[in-house]
Amino acid sequence: MAKPLTERFFIPKEVKVMGRWSVEDVTVEDPSLKPYINLDARILPHSHGRYAKKPFGKANVHIVERLINKVMRSGASHYKAGGHFMRREHRSIMSKKMKAYEVVKEAFMIIERRTKQNPIQVLVKAIENSAPREDTTTIAFGGIRYHMSVDVSPLRRLDIALKNIALGASIKCYRNKTTYAQALAEEIIAAANKDPKSFAYSKKEEIERIAQSSR
């Protein structure tokens, strides 16, 4: 007779992200972002691209995996950020998900040491503080173009926040001795505390200020 699964395999009582951090106590205070911030319990945040071609499929991707995917981006390639074009600065982790995974894991360990909090909760708070509620779009009326304030959808708010957090980390470690993991940890902590030194938080304030003037 075959032995039960609990004797044949190691089955953990609690599934923790990266084997270290629980998501059971992580809360999302923003009601519009709550349905789109995926906090499912899983050890390895990797979906193998199964939601890539599905409408609104990004809502099913774990929030830590979405951060890892943004870390793999090349930086500001068509415009200046922090006064620099940074397309080739972090090419060592571009399209290399395992390296990006290790960078995010190291950043989370730094956040845990500095804040004594669950780094996933700090990340969620940083996203909430960096997600703009308003933006501007261009409309044409009578041959003249105008800027008009519009509401931002929750999924786009999440995209903008994660993109700017990763880009802010790239700016902080551009051509200096700061590692990307250290810069990412500093950016997430600053955004969670609404610190103006955070690129993501200051960018959100700038977007909303421009949108308010275009009402």
UniProtKB/Swiss-Prot annotation:
Q: Which GO terms describe its biological process?
A: ribosomal small subunit assembly; translation
Q: Name one GO cellular component term.
A: ribosome
Please state the span of the N-terminal signal peptide per the UniProt entry.
none
Which Pfam families does the annotation name? Ribosomal_S7
- Example of a GO MF term: rRNA binding
Q: For this UniProt record, give its keywords in alphabetical order, as a comma-separated list.
A: Ribonucleoprotein, Ribosomal protein, RNA-binding, rRNA-binding
Q: Please give the InterPro entries that the UniProt record associates with this protein.
A: Ribosomal_uS7, Ribosomal_uS7_arc, Ribosomal_uS7_dom, Ribosomal_uS7_dom_sf, Ribosomal_uS7_euk/arc
Family as reported in the entry's similarity comment: Belongs to the universal ribosomal protein uS7 family.
On assembly, the entry states: Part of the 30S ribosomal subunit.
Functional note? One of the primary rRNA binding proteins, it binds directly to 16S rRNA where it nucleates assembly of the head domain of the 30S subunit. Is located at the subunit interface close to the decoding center.
Stated name of the protein: Small ribosomal subunit protein uS7
Source organism (scientific name): Thermococcus kodakarensis (strain ATCC BAA-918 / JCM 12380 / KOD1)
User: Which gene name belongs to this protein?
Assistant: rps7
